[in-house]
Structure formats: structure tokens, C-alpha cells
Amino acid sequence: GLQGMLDIGGKIWIYYEGDIPVCSIMFIPSGEDAKNDLEIEGIDYNLMGDIGPVFVNFDYLGHGLMYQMLQKFDEYLESIGYKYVMTTVHPDNIFSSRNMVKNGMKKVSQKVFKRGLRDIYFKELD
């Protein structure tokens, strides 16, 4: 659960405008468990961060907030020595998929998870 993710070093960023939560993003350290999902050889899965749930307030859609959060997410991962980032996106979620691609991620596969079908995106950080 959430506490378990925080206990292993996960973080949640929530951005506000005044008292209104505008957007949020979650970092989950991937670890060796991600090997089964990603199936990419030759990378250190302990140096990979997973983009967890992302939220953008409906009233703030279309302002580039997700893309800005993804950039900050990458900066954070680089600052703690991580080399890779991955995430999963529902195939019907065109907006998130476009933001992942805009942020330099590539769709590497598609799998069925507990929450249903997901596209898997991955990139190596600079």
C-alpha cells in the first residue's frame, strides 16, 4: 500500500494554487521486481524510478502541468543517482501517453496488470 511505498523511499509531490490541489505525481523506487514487467536486459533495476499515479485537477487540464511534473521528476531521479524511468499508462489515456512521449519515453511493451491493460513506457536518463 501507500505506506509501504513511502517506507521504501517513495515520494509524493502535490502542487497547490492557494488551497486548491492542482496536480501531483508519485515516485516509486522500482527495484528488481520491475524485471518481470519491463524485461529489459542489462540495466540495474535498483537505479530505476517508477512514475506512480499522476493527478491533474480537471480545471487545470491543458496547461502543461503533467509535462512540467515529468521534467521535475526526471531532475529528482538524476539528483539521487537514478539512471532509468518507467511507467504504465492505460492505452486509452492519449493525454498521458503523449506526455510520456514528449518527455522522451518510448513505449516498450503492453501487459495486463491487476488494474487491466497497460502500455509500458521507459527511458534512460541523460
Question: Which ranges hold each PLM region?
Answer:
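Active-site rim helix/loop that mediates acceptor-substrate recognition in acyltransferases
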Residues: 1-13, 17, 26, 32
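Glycine-rich acetyl-CoA-binding "A-motif" of GNAT/NAT acetyltransferases
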Residues: 20-23, 95
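Conserved acyl-donor/pantetheine-binding loop and adjacent beta-alpha core of acyl/acetyltransferases
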Residues: 24-53
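A short, internal acetyl-CoA/4′-phosphopantetheine-binding micro-motif in the GNAT/acyltransferase core
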Residues: 51-62, 89-90
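Conserved acetyl-CoA-binding loop-helix of GNAT-fold acetyltransferases
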Residues: 56, 62-75, 98, 102
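Conserved GNAT acetyl-CoA-binding A-motif
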Residues: 77-89
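Conserved active-site alpha-helix within GNAT-family acetyltransferase domains
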Residues: 91-109
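C-terminal "cap" of GNAT-fold acetyltransferases
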Residues: 112-126
